Structure formats: C-alpha cells, structure tokens
Design a protein with these regions (language model features):
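Extended, hydrophobic alpha-helical segments in both membrane/secreted and soluble proteins
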Residues: 1-2, 26, 42-45, 49-63, ...
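C-terminal helical/tail subdomains of lipid-metabolizing enzymes
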Residues: 285-342, 348-365
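Glycine-rich oxoanion-binding loops at beta->alpha junctions
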Residues: 2-39
C-alpha cells in the first residue's frame, strides 16, 4: 500500500512484493530480474509462516540455479532472528523488531525496510515523522479535537450502535488504491473478535466489514447500491487538496465527483418516480490530505492505527491478538500433510469429502 502510494518518490530501485503462496505471485515478481542484481528481504515475525518460508525457499533455489552465493542475496526482517540465522541468513543481514509488534501495525518497524529501499531513507524518515506527529496529536489534543478518537467514535457508532455491518473506504486518489485492502487487515484482524478481552460474552457487534475501491471507478460499480440499496453502508472518502500530477482539470473533476457523491449520499433527491427517488441520510465522512507525500501518509496510517485501537477499547476487545489467523495456520498444516500423504486426515471432519475429491482429481503438469 505505502509503496504504491509513494510511487512518485521511488529512488530508482525496482521493489516488488510477494505475499501469496500461489506460485504465480513469485513467478510474476521474478520475471525479467537478474539473480546477480536481486536482493530478497524475507519479512516474517516468526520466520515460520508456511507461505513466506515456501516462497523464500523458491527464491533461494532461483538464486542457486544461477550459481550465486545465495547468502549474499538475502536479508531478513523478523522478531525471531535466531530462526533467520538458522535458515542461513547471516546475522549481520538480519534486522530484528520486537515480538509484540503485530504485522498490521509494523509499517514503521524494520518490516518497512523494502519501503525504505523504494523511497529512500530521507522519505522514510519523513513518513516516520508524520506518524510521530500524529502520535503527539493523540497524546495532547482534547477528545473533541482528537482526530483518531473522533474517527473511532464515528466508526463505532455506525458499526455497533446503528448496527451498520460494513463500511466502504473509497480513496479519490488512485495512488491510494490499496488503502481499502490495508484497512481490511488493520481493522478486521484487530477488532473482528467474538468475545471480550477478558473472555466474556459481548453484548454487541464488533468490527465492520471493510471494503472499497478508488473513485471514480467505484461510482460505476457499487455506488448504485450505496445510494438506493436496502442496506445502508457508511462511506469514507479519502483524497488530497493538491493534485499528484500536472493535470489540474482532471484533479478538479476528481474532487467534484467526490463532493457530489458525499452530497448525494447525505441529502438524497426527491422525485415523483420511485425508481429515481433517493432517501439520503446515508452516513459518510471525508478525509482530506493537503497532499500525498511521505509525511501525510505516515500521519494517515497512524491515525487509522490509533482509531483502530480506540475502537477496540470501545468494543471491549483485544485489538492485538489474532487467534483466527493462528487457527487457519494450524489447520493448513493438517491439510498440507494430508495432501503430501495422499490421504484425507480424520481431523478434517467437515472437509473430508472435499479433500478426498481433490486428492482424486489433482494433477500436476510435468
């Protein structure tokens, strides 16, 4: 997300990210690259995540196939440096962060090393300063003028008190096109919990479903539902005052569309024809940055991080665990072992027929 948002400030290095265990992801990232001029940064908190380590093994094999000392082409960002060294990465090329830093809150840690490579040290420090400025604002501002607190209250009221189960994040800035996906993990992994932080029952709902696409594209996809659908969906618009390029007319049209959508959602429109009637009263918020740069992006990310934590506190959940993710990892190990053995595991009580079907039909191209 951040590398995409700050692509106009890239230093000249080609930086590609691989997160999916689907082989197509790594294949696409390696396309056109020279092993002698490629550095891999393996980013893993535990250095045991199956997807990450499988991709790392494949990347290492790719370097070895070129007859190169692979250890000179790898670095690690991890909270478990011992595991990285045991895997073969030299200690001096292993960058450690605290084990209490969750992945979704780790952009400002050494996990941000690839971003630093992309935009340069100075720009990365500007992003960190933007985060620190937002941190200082949170600590010093009164609740009534505290941006993360006000933002958290807005999302909490919509999701919990008004019981509106989703929120659409629509950046009217194409370089922020990955912001909705970033917030999906930040918000839903943090606050998508079914019990209180003490293990007790919750008397209310928790995290909304976060989704979205950049404007104006979304206007021609899901905005019809936002305006006239039976399910009310809060919308969060994010944009910038200053354009990113030289086309001022295009930027003015972009902002005009955003403001028009905010007005239409809030005010609606009357008509004798019920098909053309808009009820309005559809909640929406607008976040405007002066410009999209490293400092403002850092402040924006920190604002969302603080807001997420405040929402979790209001909901009474622990925003800093993710046992649902851990369950998926453990079940994936059982499924992977079953595929390796060619026999469905008895522990797969609900998906036993599916595993048997897959094992019967699976084929690999030679």
């Amino acid at each position: 997300m951040a590398a995409r948002a700050l692509r106009r400030f890239h230093s000249g290095l080609i930086v590609r990210f691989v997160s999916n265990v689907d082989a197509a992801d790594l294949d696409a990232a390696l396309e056109g690259l020279n092993p002698q001029r490629t550095l891999f940064i393996v980013s893993s908190k535990t250095f045991t995540t199956l997807e990450t380590m499988h991709n790392a093994e494949r990347a290492r094999a790719w370097v070895l196939a070129a007859g190169i000392d692979w250890t000179s082409r790898f670095a690690a960002a991890t909270a478990n440096p011992g595991a990285a060294v045991a895997w073969g990465i030299p200690a001096e090329q292993t960058f450690e962060f605290f084990d209490w830093v969750g992945g979704r809150f780790s952009l400002s840690s050494v996990i941000g090393l690839p971003l630093m490579c992309a935009i340069g040290v100075d720009r990365f420090n500007e992003m960190l300063q933007g985060m620190r400025d937002m941190d200082d604002h949170v600590l010093s501002a009164s609740p009534a003028t505290n941006l993360p607190i006000m933002h958290a209250l807005t999302w909490f009221v919509n999701a919990v008190l008004l019981q509106l189960p989703t929120v659409a994040v629509v950046p009217y800035s194409h370089d922020l096109s990955r912001l909705p996906a970033f917030l999906q993990q930040l918000v839903m992994e943090s606050n998508g919990k079914g019990v209180a932080h003490d293990g007790g029952a919750l008397p209310h709902g928790t995290s909304p479903v976060v989704w979205g696409e950049p404007g104006t594209n979304g206007q021609h996809a899901f905005f019809q539902m936002l305006h006239q659908g039976t399910q009310i969906v809060p919308v969060e618009f994010v944009s910038t005052v200053a354009p990113l390029g030289d086309d001022l007319i295009a930027h003015d049209l972009l902002i005009a569309n955003m403001i028009a959508q905010a007005e239409a959602l809030a005010a609606g429109s009357t008509s004798e024809d019920p098909q053309q009637r808009f009820s309005g009263n559809r909640p929406n918020t607008v976040i405007m940055l002066e410009r999209l740069d490293a400092h403002s992006l850092g402040a924006l990310v920190a604002m969302y991080e603080h807001s997420t934590a405040v929402q979790g506190w209001l909901m009474g959940v622990n925003s800093f665990d993710q046992f649902g993710v851990e369950l998926g990892k453990s079940m994936a190990k059982i499924a992977a072992n079953a595929i390796e053995k060619g026999e469905a595991d008895s522990a797969q009580t609900m998906t036993h027929p599916l595993m048997e079907w897959f094992l019967h039909h699976r084929q690999y191209n030679s």
